[in-house]
Amino acid sequence: VAMILSYAKDITRAYGGNVVRDCVITVPTFATQLEREALLVAAELADMRVLSLIEANTAAALQFGLDRKYEETKVILFYNAGSEAVQASLVEYSTFPDKGGGKNKTVGQFEVKGKGWKKGAGGFAIDLALTELLADGFNKKWNAKKQKGDVRTIPRAMAKIRAAAKKTKEVLSANEKIPVGIPSLHDDIDFSMTLTRPELEKAAAEVLDVATQPIIDALDAANMTVDDIDGVEIIGGGVRVPRVQAVLREFLTERRTNKSDVPELSVHLNGDEAVALGAALHGANV
């Protein structure tokens, strides 16, 4: 981790022209106290001064509220489908009067009311499900020509399959089907098969089945229901999978009392940059 932070510092120096040592580091909601302390030690080894740690969804919520001021209290659900986990946060935005300088004005503020998460339910889990599907497909072709074997025991071949699985997921997020081809995958055998979006969704069914659990946990922690949610903001690479968004819509519709007033899944934020931008904003105000 210290080496990664050192590399990030080198990139900053190369592009910014100055040595940057002060930083704000984002952590997942489920990071333990020991893990956070270890991260601080890693930053010290990288010769960086940590101004603050901030949870990823909180950083995104900060970035979201930068250009918004709600006259009435609003509750926004932040759904973050990353690589390793899914995190959900219920954030309440409001205003308070500020009479500083003799002027009456209102200032925006937010408070995280509830959080939930599910490890092993992110985009990487879908990659693994597709990897298993492709491995099974190759085994059928391989075993039809050779003696019984399992490509999963061949590290080099599996590395190729994992790379193909990731690309397949990305393409099927925008297309209904894709021809997958891996030349000379193993034992001089070329591998090819066509995968469809429904096949991806079936392979990743176990992952998709728990996609909404973090929302349930966040609602329970905040003592709220879906009826209390005024808006939904989705971030993270995992939300690009169409079925993930479909599952979220189905969940919100099913649990909403007024079916004609179900909040849309919004993408006001850049899902890849929002957390980093929010952390930078926090650092500028520490």
What are the functions of these language-model segments?
Residues 3, 12-286:
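Oxyanion-binding/catalytic loops of NTP- or PPi-dependent enzymes
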